Amino acid sequence: MKIYLGSRNIKPEGFKTLDISPACNPDIVADITQMPQIQDGSCSELIASHVLEHLCWPDSFKAMAEMARILKVGGVLKIAVPDLRILLEMIKSQGLPFYAVGMIFGQGAGSDFHNQHHYGFTAEMLLQILKFLGFSDFDWWNSALPEGANGWYWAGQEKIAVSLNIKAVKKRPPSCDTEKIFELLKSNPLQEFSRIIAMETSSEIADEQISEPLLYQRIHFKLIDAMQRIAYLENILKEQK
């Protein structure tokens, strides 16, 4: 089974949809922090596109732990969130402070609690959490759907890339009891995630290098590869004229 989490009105072909709001008419009505309707290891792919930032911390950790629970070993998880690192750079150097701050806090949601942003992530933060939950083979993913994971938002007359899209494969169960970790995070939400994990496990996250720059290098490689393919096709079209 494949599930598109936090579906709103989007219904991708081949996916069941899940949303907290019955008004969105999803296949499954549920809170992504608690999905008892879905059996352990019953899913082959999950997409959570611009969902996690709408949860408070550490509820977002609890949601990712639930995703790990329902995914089978070898299953694929695709997450997209606003890229805090890029947004902070926009505040510092690109002259778009109101736009960037609005993206961070989810301006436009108004009084709709579920559409407001309550937390944010960098690639490093997501990689730490996903590694603990048993994921690896991290990569970038692209979405053709009409939603935030396609990577672009309009800022005036320009398209701005602000979406952090991470794909990961579940390799094993979490390193220890995720409910215990959730309670520890809840009791001290400002504590560094890696320190809490180091206290409860054999410091696997702290010992292993998880490279955020490597992830971005893969993005750049794919961009260069795509540009080369476009140039190749353009040359063929010129020759055919």
Where do the language-model regions lie?
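Heptad-repeat positions
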Residues: 216, 223, 230, 237-240
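Conserved SAM-binding loop
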Residues: 2-89, 124, 166-170
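S-adenosyl-L-methionine-dependent methyltransferase catalytic module, highlighting the catalytic core
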Residues: 59-62, 66, 72, 76-210
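Short, Lys/Arg-enriched, disordered terminal segments
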Residues: 1, 240-241
